Amino acid sequence: MPVVVIVHRLKNFDEWLKLFKADPPPKIGRWRLLRGSDDRNRVHVVGEVAASEVKAVKDFIGSQHMQDVFKRVNAMSTAPLEVIWLEELAP
């Protein structure tokens, strides 16, 4: 199952959370919000999607609306956000 991880290194988690709640992930797949236990301003938004949903999620992330949101996020971050696509390997 493909996984996308969006890594945020924030200046202020509470300010970012307001923006996140206003523009949540798509309703495609299963999404989790993880916060660093050692750095409370590091956040990972993790989405698990079916292979058939990857294109829709990539289209959502690449949409003009989300690019505008990401510009706002980067302005409240200590580093640019990072989008990482992963695929599961059998052990």
Report each predicted region and the residues it spans:
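Short S/T/G/P-rich N-terminal loop/turn motif that feeds into the first structured element of a domain
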Residues: 1-91
